[in-house]
A protein has these predicted regions:
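Cytosol/matrix-facing amphipathic helices and coiled-coil assembly/linker segments
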Residues: 90-104
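Short intracellular "coupling" helices and adjacent cytoplasmic loop segments at the cytosolic face
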Residues: 80-94
Length: 382
């Protein structure tokens, strides 16, 4: 859901939940024992309770309300987001688009939604992309650093436990600040593809640098290149937040078909947690057995996922949710490359049809079928 000329600010709550400073504080203030490891876990209850409390005052999703034919409430919800009146033209136009998107579609239960994911190739592709995005997000190595940063910093020369925890805390602050900047200033102005492509390439280079450093200098003693590698860890956090920190969640929810979005995002969320667990379990073994190869794996994965986005995912920035389906119609590869950095130069004069051109063509086809006494295809009903 997106109103014209309205930019939604996605909250960086997920970045705020990292208790790195709590870990640092208890390590220097509380003697080793059960309380020292229990307290950081207990503290995480606080943001969860606050999140639950404040969600009680949030309006329902306009699309959820439209699906249940509560149109007046949907208009109020849209107006709340846009900070305008429910009767304003922008709200009514967006509401009409949402209603049209649901027209002719029955309300599906969760199991039925999973069955409908293979309805056709286009729907299947739109359902797969969110899970692929979250799969790649985990293989970028972000949770390997989040969970094992003290060990990683120690391997890079910060031997003291307190110092490594402090360095981990600084890493968390860097990610939090960068997340706020990206959500406020970058994600809408740069677009989804640019942030994912440039962020993936940059974070991949940082991982490859760290892997190369550890391969050449396995001894944790400090040399001049050690400081460059420590900076590379922080730059990795910056570039991750720039691209693969939150953009996969935004892009995934946008490309998912509206009538299947709950099931699609449930599958994407399940993929996230499955591979979070896989990375958490695999990283210690990887660091112990392939050492520097661990960073190379994450670096190569980051470059690969940037390449996949470049060639296989269309740009959704500025496109209302109700029009995203048109991005997957006709010459999808051309559209994906055209939207990518440097893509227009590569394609030369070749261009994909615009959304308006696709709508007009679909309308003409529907009119022809109606004139011949045939029902218009559902996919061409706007």
């Amino acid at each position: 859901m997106r109103l014209p000329r309205v930019r939604l600010f996605r909250s960086p709550l997920d970045a705020c939940r990292d208790p790195v400073w709590v870990n640092y504080g208890v390590s220097i203030q509380i003697a080793p024992g059960e309380l020292q490891w229990r307290l950081p876990i207990i503290v995480q209850i606080i943001p969860g309770v606050l999140f639950f409390f404040f969600m009680l005052f949030q309006p329902e999703s306009p699309r959820w309300l439209v699906e249940r034919e509560r149109y007046d409430d949907a208009a109020k919800s849209l107006a709340y987001i846009a900070r305008t009146d429910p009767s304003s033209p922008a709200v009514q136009h967006t509401l009409a688009e949402i209603r049209a998107d649901f027209a002719g579609r029955p309300t599906l239960g969760l199991i039925a939604q999973f069955r409908q994911m293979g309805e056709n190739k286009t729907i299947a592709l739109r359902c797969i992309i969110p899970s692929v995005l979250t799969f790649f997000q985990q293989w970028s190595g972000t949770n390997a650093i989040n969970y094992y940063a003290p060990e990683i910093f120690a391997a890079l020369g910060i031997a003291s436990t307190t110092a490594s925890l402090f360095a981990t805390g600084v890493y968390g602050v860097v990610k939090f600040v960068m997340t706020c900047i990206v959500l406020a200033c970058v994600i809408e102005s740069w677009g989804r593809k640019r942030t994912l492509v440039w962020g993936g390439l940059a974070q991949g280079l940082m991982m490859l640098w760290i892997g190369g450093y550890v391969a050449v200098h396995p001894d944790p003693s400090v040399v001049p290149a050690t400081y460059v590698s420590l900076v590379a860890v922080y730059l990795y956090g910056v570039f991750f937040c720039l691209g693969w920190g939150f953009t996969p969640l935004v892009l995934g929810s946008e490309v998912a078909p509206g009538h299947l979005r709950p099931a699609v995002m449930a599958l994407a969320s399940g993929t996230t947690w499955l591979f979070t667990y896989v990375i958490a379990q695999a990283t210690p073994s990887m660091l112990a057995h392939i050492t520097w190869g661990t960073y190379v794996v994450f670096g190569v994965a980051s470059v690969a996922m940037a390449a996949w986005v470049w060639i296989g995912v269309p740009e959704t920035t500025g496109v209302p949710l109700e029009d995203v389906k048109w991005l997957f119609e006709d010459d999808l590869w051309v559209r994906c490359v055209e939207d990518a950095p440097g893509g227009r130069w590569l394609l030369g004069k070749r261009r994909a049809l615009t959304i308006d051109e696709l709508k007009n063509r679909a309308g003409a086809r529907a009119a022809e079928k109606t004139g011949e006494g045939e029902p218009a295809d559902e996919q061409f009903i706007i």
